[in-house]
């Protein structure tokens, strides 16, 4: 599903099998007060996200760790294999430090345990999309 605001300047892929989290993230992105507006695409698992990444370019991926068909870490490995430089914020209910270290070693921008603070998420989203030197480049 794709949602676009009238002045969308950045494209975000939300990957999570929990539709309540997807709705929360979509709503939050619409409320953030920094200079960007977002075109949002969603995927319910890593396999659908991989198809979206083949089809489109994104400025940011918000990624759940544990999903059916392909985990977040498996998707990250595929993204790196494709040489995608898209910043990834990994959102997870797992607060295990080893898992966080593995995710960070995979090249994610930030590891965010659930439940997360929306102000903290807003700050990280702003930093991540601003870290790109060119819009939606591979």
PLM regions: where:
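Active-site beta3 strand of CheY-like receiver
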Residues: 56-62
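Short, conserved "switch-loop" micro-motifs in signal-transduction and mechanochemical regulators
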Residues: 82, 94-95, 106
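C-terminal output helix
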Residues: 116-126
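Acidic catalytic/metal-coordinating carboxylates
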Residues: 45-48, 71-74
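Receiver (REC) domain active-site loop signature in two-component systems and cognate sites
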Residues: 67
């Amino acid at each position: 599903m794709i949602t676009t605001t009238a002045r969308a300047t950045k494209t975000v892929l939300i990957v999570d099998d929990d539709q309540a989290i997807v709705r929360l993230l979509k709503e939050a992105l619409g409320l953030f007060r920094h200079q960007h507006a977002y075109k949002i695409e969603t995927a319910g698992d890593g396999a659908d996200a991989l198809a979206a990444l083949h089809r489109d370019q994104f400025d940011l991926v918000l990624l759940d760790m544990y999903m059916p068909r392909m985990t977040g870490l498996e998707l990250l490995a595929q993204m790196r294999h494709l040489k995608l430089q898209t910043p990834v914020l990994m959102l997870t209910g797992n607060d295990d430090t080893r898992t966080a270290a593995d995710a960070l070693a995979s090249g994610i921008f930030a590891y965010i345990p659930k439940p997360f603070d929306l102000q903290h998420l807003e700050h990280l989203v702003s930093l991540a999309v601003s870290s790109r030197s060119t819009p939606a480049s591979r």
